[in-house]
């Protein structure tokens, strides 16, 4: 399965990364990037590892939530692709 980031999700990731570079330094920004990308890349192999709450509006539309430390990756599986909507 492949993982594709929607434009908004990629922009959110870049904003977080820039914030960490500016506010806490490059080493923490690299750790943040490794953690986020490592977790999201696992979705290619384990696409159903995120939680679905079918009693919510997002769950009714098959959106999943992958919790990564203090962040939530919102994604949806469509045929052979995982689409990352928000971070």
Residue map of PLM features:
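Basic, Lys/Arg-enriched alpha-helical interface segments
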Residues: 2-3, 7-57
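Enriched for short, Lys/Arg-rich terminal
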Residues: 61, 68-72, 76-87
């Amino acid at each position: 399965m492949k993982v594709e980031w929607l434009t908004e999700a990629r922009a959110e990731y870049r904003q977080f990364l820039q914030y960490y570079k500016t506010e806490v330094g490059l080493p923490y920004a690299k750790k943040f990037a490794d953690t986020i990308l490592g977790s999201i890349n696992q979705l290619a192999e384990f696409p159903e590892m995120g939680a679905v709450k079918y009693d919510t509006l997002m769950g009714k539309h098959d959106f999943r939530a992958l919790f990564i430390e203090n962040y939530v990756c919102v994604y949806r599986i469509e045929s052979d692709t995982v689409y990352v909507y928000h971070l």
